[in-house]
Amino acid sequence: MTAASATTARVERIAMGVTCVATVVGIDSHDLAVRCLDLVEEIESLWSRFIPTSDISRLNSADGQPTVVDDRTLTLLHHMIAAHQATEGAYNPTRLPLQIAAGDTHSLINDRSTTLAANATVYSHLSGIQIFHDGKVSLPRGMTLDAGGIGKGLAADFILQFALEHGAQATCINLGGDMAINTGDSIGWDVEILSPLDPGVILDTVRISVGGVATSSLFARQRNSAGIASHLFTDSSAHDTQHTVGATVIANSAAWSEAWTKYAILSNPAQAIDTLTNTGLAAMLVSADGHTTKTESWKTFTHD
């Protein structure tokens, strides 16, 4: 009997408000890729602010009452807290009231919408989040969370691990630009970094063998005539679109990459490059005029 050989499957689906792509190398690669995208939808049902029964929606409407959530949601919350601390508050998942006030109330792919309680407010710290040993979580009254980009990044990390545990030899999970990759060798796969100003322009190509790469821009919640001009905020207002408008960060996970893109965009460019360099991260920033600024370590991932 001839042993089955590995094949490569690439399957895509719209979920989490973005195009999700699972690329899997292995035996039964197509079936595994489909299962990966099924898992995207399962995680979306836990974390979407547009689904009233999701863990995130239930926490946001609990008015401070302890709420039982999935173990994966507990992991998400721990990542949120760690990212908020590491980025000195640049990543802040409590800014949903600002997004809603700016008009970001509806899903970009269906007719679902988000409504918040009248007391919803932005918090400058996350120390009030209580995570109990029995799997319950309590948010301070008025705090609302948005899984957003870090949710997509963490979902990509979860699903990459799922694929590897189920026989994949190599996998790339790409959830709208938040990518978790393990090629199973040192060669790596090429990732094209597109301009946030013109998606038809490739700014650079990086090669990743293991880890995460995330690209974020101010315009991520804007599609055609829908959405808002800038979806990233400081604690009081939308970020000025005349400064950094997009960033790509390479790290050891998609979730961590995604969190640091927020820091990169919301910070002074020179300060961002210094901090990212000192943190050991490779990054590229894009300004409003299309100019790119890169950390010194960026070139270790390119073909130059």
Model-identified regions with their sequence ranges:
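Mature catalytic core of soluble alpha/beta enzymes
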Residues: M1-D304
